[in-house]
Amino acid sequence: KSLHFSLAEIAEVISRLKGVKGRMQALHVPGKALVVVDYAHTPDALQQVLRALRWHCKGELYCLFGCGGDRDKGKRPLMAAIAEREADHLILTSDNPRNEDPEQIMRDIQQGLSGKKPVYNEQDRQAAIHYAVQKAQARDIVLIAGKGHEAYQLVKGIRYPFDDALIVQQLLSAPR
């Protein structure tokens, strides 16, 4: 049954829709790489988002991620293998280490790597994001995976303010 709206009216409404924060959240400034913040924190989710981004990528695909502490340790090497297979550049970092040693989490992740691609390891997530955004070129895509909408980094029981998208917006708006 027809809703009695013209295509122009439908298109106008669609153009005003906003996506969900932290789910394939695209951040872009002309002349710089497209940065996508996504909550992908499981092997399947990481694979799906990387494959979707690869389809649109005209340059290199960067994947920045970490794995949460006090969570399923078995997924850590699986996510590394997926990122290594699907992306051109890997950046490993912290993602809510909770009560675990962030360096140990990164070592666990590295167990899934074959060594075929160089990996940049930076425990400080903000520094890792800075590295990825500055290294990527205009035709590249940078995926920042794992935290998505979360506005904190959980370390030793303390929630520190931390927002991937906000950090990216600040970096993209700064002169290169």
Role assignments for model-derived ranges:
Residues 1-176:
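ATP-dependent carboxylate-amine ligase
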